[in-house]
């Protein structure tokens, strides 16, 4: 969908018009060499979810930078328009152009607004690593996305933690940033991938390009599997591996280094069966791209058959439309029907201050005994409630508010959360 052009000064205005609607620019989310991303919300449509405005070619950009921005815009637009509809790929709402002056157009993509990135999750879990539940969730979602885009003939070519984001509404991880993507067999990008997540064949190709030499072969979808293997190893270890994967020790025997990482973690938590994850990661990190496991085959790994449960930290970090309140009801309330109904009504009334409540559940038996599960109409209301209810006093006790997987809640599956 293309929108009409509109005037925009050097600084982002509070409002802009696109697609026949007025949009409020609320804040800048981030910026790079060729684009900036802003949080925007459609005015006059109460309850509409916010969006992400990716603006290419910021004011003052000229020359090679301007060409790179235009190229990145065209690449990302083409890829997203062809790959639309997959739940693990960011949704493109539309495309429009802003004119800072008659000769300086700024291309814009309006995208769905996502939540926390894997990069942020790695910072939170530094040194201790992510839970197996989170690693499994992320691995499955990214592999589903890769299997789809590889089937469509695309290579993402810049898979890294910052480009994998959580969707609170869809309760899954999604891929973003297709500015370096290309059609397999038609690699029109010389320099691909980010340092630390770059496959050996891409590293060689980049070195040759810097020397002004042409590579004999093009990179394939296997480069994406290498990047994912490094990301999963970082999530498991809690360590950045940029220097490790560039070391001579890694090049000599990466398998032994992976074994050492898993062995050291096994000492900390021997109860977790991690060998299936280890084998999956190894299958993604063969130096020979021809031996690397394809995404579709990786989804058949026995690692995905293990029913891991989330840690409480996972349910704090990953927003969903469902809120779980702890430390609210004790046994006295649960065993007295009148008091139980009164306190449940009080809790519901308090929760409705943050948005429409679809359902509310307070189990009287385990699992979940005494916990309050609140399903909101959308994740935005749930996030607002979680932020404001955490630490509140209720009947003399501090409330602890976490999120809870909507899919599990709908099935009546109440996890025994790991602490």
Curated annotation (Swiss-Prot):
Domain RRM: from-to ranges: 323-405
Top-rank EC class of the record's enzyme: transferase
Keywords: ATP-binding, Kinase, Nucleotide-binding, Nucleus, RNA-binding, Serine/threonine-protein kinase, Transferase
Residue numbers binding ATP: 29-37, 54
Protein name: Serine/threonine-protein kinase Kist
Domain of life: Eukaryota
Localization (cell): Nucleus
Keyword Chloroplast: no
Subunit structure of this chain's protein: Interacts with PAM and CDKN1B/p27Kip1. Interacts with stathmin.
Catalytic activity: L-seryl-[protein] + ATP = O-phospho-L-seryl-[protein] + ADP + H(+); L-threonyl-[protein] + ATP = O-phospho-L-threonyl-[protein] + ADP + H(+)
EC number: 2.7.11.1
Principal cellular location given in the protein's record: nucleus
CC per GO annotation: axon; cytoplasm; dendrite cytoplasm; neuronal ribonucleoprotein granule; nucleoplasm; nucleus
Described purpose of this protein according to its UniProt entry: Upon serum stimulation, phosphorylates CDKN1B/p27Kip1, thus controlling CDKN1B subcellular location and cell cycle progression in G1 phase. May be involved in trafficking and/or processing of RNA.
Taxonomic placement: Eukaryota, Metazoa, Chordata, Craniata, Vertebrata
Record Pfam families: Pkinase (PF00069), RRM_1 (PF00076)
InterPro entries found in the cross-reference section: Kinase-like_dom_sf, Nucleotide-bd_a/b_plait_sf, Prot_kinase_dom, RBD_domain_sf, RRM_dom, UHMK1, UHMK1_RRM
Entries under PROSITE patterns matching the protein: PROTEIN_KINASE_DOM, RRM
Gene Ontology BP term (one): neuron projection development
Family per record: Belongs to the protein kinase superfamily. Ser/Thr protein kinase family.
């Amino acid at each position: 969908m293309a929108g009409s052009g509109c005037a925009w000064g050097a600084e982002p205005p509070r409002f802009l018009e696109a697609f026949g609607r007025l949009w409020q620019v609320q804040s800048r989310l981030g910026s790079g060499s060729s684009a900036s991303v802003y949080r925007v919300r459609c005015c006059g449509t109460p309850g509409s979810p916010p969006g992400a405005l990716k603006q290419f070619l910021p004011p003052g950009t000229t020359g090679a930078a301007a060409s790179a921005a235009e190229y990145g815009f065209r690449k990302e637009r083409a890829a997203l328009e062809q790959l639309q509809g997959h739940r693990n790929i960011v949704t493109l709402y539309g495309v429009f152009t802003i004119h800072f002056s008659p000769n300086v157009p700024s291309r814009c993509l309006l995208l769905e607004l996502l939540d926390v990135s894997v990069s942020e999750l790695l910072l939170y879990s530094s040194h201790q690593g992510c839970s197996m539940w989170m690693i499994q969730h992320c691995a499955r979602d990214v592999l589903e996305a890769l299997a789809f885009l590889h089937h469509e003939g695309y290579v993402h070519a810049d898979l890294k933690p910052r480009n994998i984001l959580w969707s609170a509404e869809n309760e899954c991880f999604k891929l973003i940033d297709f500015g370096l993507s290309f059609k397999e067999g038609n690699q029109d990008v010389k320099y691909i991938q980010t340092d630390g997540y770059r496959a050996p064949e891409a590293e060689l190709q980049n070195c040759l390009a810097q020397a002004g030499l042409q590579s004999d072969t093009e990179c394939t979808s296997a480069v994406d599997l290498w990047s994912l293997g490094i990301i999963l190893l970082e999530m498991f270890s809690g360590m950045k591996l940029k220097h490790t994967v560039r070391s001579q020790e890694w090049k000599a025997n990466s398998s032994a280094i992976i074994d050492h990482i898993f062995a050291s973690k096994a000492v900390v938590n021997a109860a977790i069966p991690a060998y299936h994850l280890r084998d999956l990661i190894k299958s993604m990190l063969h130096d020979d791209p021809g031996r690397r496991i394809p995404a579709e085959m990786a989804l058949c790994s026995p690692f995905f058959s293990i029913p891991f449960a989330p840690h409480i930290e996972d349910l704090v970090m990953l927003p969903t439309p469902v809120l779980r309140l702890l430390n609210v009801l004790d046994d006295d309330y649960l065993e007295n029907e009148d008091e139980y109904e009164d306190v449940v009504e009080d809790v519901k009334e308090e929760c409705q201050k943050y948005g429409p409540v679809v359902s509310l559940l307070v189990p009287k038996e385990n699992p979940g005994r005494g916990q309050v599960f609140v399903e909101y109409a959308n994740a935005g209301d749930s996030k607002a409630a979680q932020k404001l209810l955490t630490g509140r006093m209720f009947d003399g006790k501090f409330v602890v508010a976490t999120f809870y997987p909507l899919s599990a809640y709908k099935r009546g599956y109440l996890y025994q959360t790991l602490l």
